């Protein structure tokens, strides 16, 4: 794991279960462990690159914040962002973070070959983004996603 952020603290297993129930998803063990140990975090003052290359369009994004559960920090909660964009994102997905490029990191639990972590360019900052396509596959699992991050 090369992600470098200032953690928000620790999520409680009970709150993780409530999140899963609210958005009708089943989070994988590796992501639950991340929430319990760090509960997300911020790249304060953009000290670290935290970059990921989107291979299909040859663009790079930089992680700003990984959201958590009940962080008590403005604009840092999974529930807040997922609820706000619920009608715009895939069913059975949650928004788990954002980037310096103003897009979101989306964890989609589709139950098929398409599930995984995506970059959702809701503001069309990337040249390749359009109304037809503004979500880009990054990784199948949270562990694979973490392995993509460069600093």
Q: Where are the regions that the model predicts?
A:
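Aromatic side chains
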Residues: 23, 31-34, 118-120, 142-145
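Generic detector of low-complexity/intrinsically disordered segments
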Residues: 5, 21, 107-108, 128, ...
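Intrinsically disordered, low-complexity regulatory segments enriched in Ser/Thr/Pro
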Residues: 113-127
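Compact, glycine/acidic-enriched structural inserts
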Residues: 123-148
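Short, surface-exposed beta-strand/loop micro-motifs that present aromatic residues
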Residues: 95, 103-110
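A surface-exposed partner-binding patch
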Residues: 1-101, 150
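Short, surface-exposed coil-to-beta transition loops
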Residues: 100-105, 131-132
């Amino acid at each position: 794991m090369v992600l470098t952020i200032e953690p928000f603290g620790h999520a409680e297993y009970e709150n993780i279960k409530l999140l899963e129930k609210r958005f009708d998803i089943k989070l994988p063990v590796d992501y639950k462990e991340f929430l319990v140990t760090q509960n997300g975090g911020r790249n304060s003052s953009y000290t670290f690159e935290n970059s990921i290359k989107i291979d299909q369009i040859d663009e790079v994004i930089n992680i700003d914040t990984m959201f958590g559960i009940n962080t008590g920090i403005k604009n840092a909660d999974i529930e807040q962002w997922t609820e706000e964009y619920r009608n715009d994102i895939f069913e059975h997905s949650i928004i788990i973070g954002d980037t310096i490029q103003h897009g979101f990191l989306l964890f989609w639990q589709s139950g098929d070959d398409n599930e995984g972590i995506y970059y959702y360019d809701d503001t069309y900052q990337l040249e390749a983004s359009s109304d037809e396509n503004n979500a880009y596959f990054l990784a199948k699992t949270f562990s694979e996603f973490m392995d993509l991050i460069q600093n």
